[in-house]
Regions:
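N-terminal leader segment of winged-helix/HTH proteins
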Residues: 1-27
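Short alpha-helical "packing" element that flanks the helix-turn-helix/winged-helix DNA-binding module
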Residues: 36-37
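Alpha-helical DNA-recognition elements
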Residues: 22, 68, 131
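Helix-turn-helix DNA-binding motif, specifically the short coil turn and the N-cap/start of the second
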Residues: 57-61
Length: 137
């Protein structure tokens, strides 16, 4: 199995997942939820469909992520003024507070892995991984 790309990607994913759960995933927070929080913070008023496209996640997954973040009272939905069928998403005061902490924890989490590479190796790794998941039709 040592020659299989999928095997190595899975092991790398598990190592990153475990570290996230131990050091960032306070209260059961998952990486996808961090991604949603960050996306809403950078794009206040974004819709669930737009988040789904931006993060390349299916709509059912986004609904579950949004539901959990709403229950934590970290985000809120507001009906759009121009289209009452559309709901816009915003961070709450509590969500902004937690995201600030999470970003610090997330940077430390990332640094634990990034520090294993020099800048050239890191950039090359990112480029190679992008080749795996982009244009995968």
């Amino acid at each position: 199995m040592g020659h299989l790309l999928g095997h190595h990607l899975r092991r790398a994913h598990l190592a990153i997942w475990r570290d996230f759960n131990e050091n960032v995933g306070h209260g059961g927070l998952r990486p996808g939820q961090f991604g949603v929080l960050s996306t809403i913070d950078q794009n206040p008023g974004i819709s669930q469909i737009e988040i789904s496209r931006f993060l390349d996640l299916d709509k059912a997954s986004i609904v579950a992520l949004i539901y959990r973040l709403e229950n934590l009272e970290w985000i809120e939905k507001r009906q759009a003024k121009e289209d009452r069928r559309r709901h816009e998403l915003f961070l709450t005061k509590e969500g902004k507070k937690h995201l600030k902490i999470l970003r610090k924890d997330m940077q430390q989490h990332e640094n634990r892995f990034i520090s294993r590479f020099n800048k050239t190796e890191y950039n090359q790794l990112i480029e190679l991984l992008r080749r795996v998941y982009l244009n995968n039709d």
